[in-house]
């Protein structure tokens, strides 16, 4: 099930509420990524404490390891990973297409060599729907081909992007048909493709709208294209998505990208950036970014962000985080991840409040001014 309530708007920015089988999600929302069934360096308890409402699981990786038999023995992903709130799973398409020369695409689906042991495997819209039914995720994504920005070292042509998008549309219908055949009680999202071409994005959305998905995602962005192209496509597509359905921007991005996405009409975001950057010592704060390995932090007694109420900022100095990073302590990665995810989730809390109070434009200006202090 999925129920979407649009509470209020401020320009194109939307304040909404998504009710799913495992709980309610207040939007706009950022969704931490748990590729293998865990958000790296975080326990479910810590995710709850920082206010995570929904997390991502990766269909492709969970299918390969631990395998569906293991997840099925736990009656789904929620019990297996000890998380009782909503979960969104991607379709596995992006990971398969990332394999490059190791895979072969046909109308039926994709044949590829397992990155785990080299076994020959096949993934199709039907198989993706079957895997996601076993995972029992609250939001299921259609199986699609993520149109690359570059093909053979040059931007994809209109013809190449059109061919890819139209196959994704045919796969969308097959995904929906299999989802319904399985009597899946959860929600299914369609994915708008079309590369950097607005007319192809419009064609994709028109085709998906006929299939009446529970929600709509924008795919194929943040795949290597210049930022101005990403924003051009985002600002074209997001306001055109059905107003009565949730809007999800896949795999994006920086704090600035999230705020720009909200301004365009996006409700849901995911990205590995806050967790991956945390492990590499790159931290996001209200007043710009912090590279904790820099020598300037060696004797700094201040918290990362004096305006932040996360466990890391309440208890530890920049000097201590610098020390942990320099000596390679696991605790450093954990404390950094707690902070970065808290920052992203707090940013979304402030965005929701600003939309409710119809001051999102002012919020956006202040956000940009604060973040413009740059990297320390």
UniProtKB/Swiss-Prot annotation:
Residues 251-257, 275-279 are annotated as: RNA binding. Gene3D superfamilies: Queuine tRNA-ribosyltransferase-like (3.20.20.105). Its cofactor is Zn(2+). The active site is at residues 90, 270. Substrate binds at residues 90-94, 144, 193, 220. It comes from the Bacteria. Binds 1 zinc ion per subunit. It catalyses: 7-aminomethyl-7-carbaguanine + guanosine(34) in tRNA = 7-aminomethyl-7-carbaguanosine(34) in tRNA + guanine. One of its GO terms (molecular function) is tRNA-guanosine(34) queuine transglycosylase activity. Homodimer. Within each dimer, one monomer is responsible for RNA recognition and catalysis, while the other monomer binds to the replacement base PreQ1. Belongs to the queuine tRNA-ribosyltransferase family. This is Queuine tRNA-ribosyltransferase. It comes from Cupriavidus taiwanensis (strain DSM 17343 / BCRC 17206 / CCUG 44338 / CIP 107171 / LMG 19424 / R1) (Ralstonia taiwanensis (strain LMG 19424)).
């Amino acid at each position: 099930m999925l129920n979407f309530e649009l509470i209020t708007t401020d320009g194109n920015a939307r304040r909404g509420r998504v009710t799913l089988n495992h709980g309610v999600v207040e939007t706009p929302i950022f969704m931490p990524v748990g590729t293998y069934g865990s958000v790296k360096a975080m326990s479910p308890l810590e995710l709850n404490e920082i206010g995570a409402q929904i997390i991502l699981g990766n269909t492709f990786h969970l299918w390969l390891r631990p395998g569906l038999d293991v997840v099925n023995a736990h009656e789904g992903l929620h019990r297996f990973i000890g998380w009782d709130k909503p979960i969104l799973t991607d379709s596995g398409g992006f990971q398969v297409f990332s394999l490059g020369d190791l895979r072969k695409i046909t109308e039926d689906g994709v044949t590829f060599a397992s990155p785990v042991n080299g076994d020959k495997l096949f993934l199709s819209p039907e198989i993706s729907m079957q895997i996601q039914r076993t995972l029992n995720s609250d939001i299921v994504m259609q199986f699609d081909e993520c149109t690359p920005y570059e093909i053979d070292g040059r931007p994809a042509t209109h013809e190449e992007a059109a061919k890819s998008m139209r196959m994704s549309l045919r796969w969308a219908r097959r995904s929906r048909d299999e989802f319904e055949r399985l009597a899946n009680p959860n929600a299914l999202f369609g994915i708008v493709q079309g590369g950097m071409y607005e007319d192809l994005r419009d064609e994709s959305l028109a085709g998906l709208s006929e299939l009446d998905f529970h929600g709509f995602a924008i795919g194929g962005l943040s795949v290597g294209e210049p930022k101005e192209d990403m924003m051009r496509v985002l600002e074209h597509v997001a306001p055109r998505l059905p107003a009565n359905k949730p809007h999800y921007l896949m795999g994006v991005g920086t704090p600035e990208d999230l705020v720009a996405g909200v301004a365009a009409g996006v409700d849901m975001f995911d990205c590995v950036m806050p967790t991956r950057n945390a492990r590499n010592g790159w931290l996001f704060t209200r007043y710009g970014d912090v590279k904790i390995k820099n020598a300037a932090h060696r004797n700094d007694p201040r918290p990362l962000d004096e305006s932040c109420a996360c466990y890391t900022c309440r208890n530890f100095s920049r000097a201590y985080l610098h020390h942990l990073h320099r000596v390679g302590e696991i605790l450093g990665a954990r404390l950094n991840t707690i902070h970065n995810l808290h920052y992203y989730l707090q940013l979304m809390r402030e965005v929701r409040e600003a939309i409710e109070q119809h001051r999102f434009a002012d919020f956006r200006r202040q956000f940009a001014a604060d973040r413009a202090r740059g990297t320390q």
